[in-house]
Amino acid sequence: MSTFRDDTGSHGASSNLTGHAVLDDHHMKVGTISDVVYDDAGTPRWAVVNPGPLRSEKFVPVEGAYMTESGELVIPYGKEQVKHAPKAPRDHILDSRTEIVLEDHYEVRHSN
């Protein structure tokens, strides 16, 4: 296992992360990473997860997540918690109000 990290320093989709499977805290597949949201310092803060056809994409915090040797991102949240998170907008832009709602939903706080 390795710590979740991305060295691109960019904002938006990262070829190093997009397309990787996301597993919940019981190693059940939640979906696939379609985009990554970075903070101003270039640190990844949120993964946009596509759960599959006919389902809405969701933001998932990367804090506490890790990459397996086989390349899956394991998050410390259950599939149901992700399922009930607010939908990610189509443009994947995360405004401050939505981020607060997401932090409450996942019970995380990011330092600014």
Q: Model features per residue range: what roles?
A:
Residues M1-N112:
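Peripheral interaction segments used for macromolecular assembly
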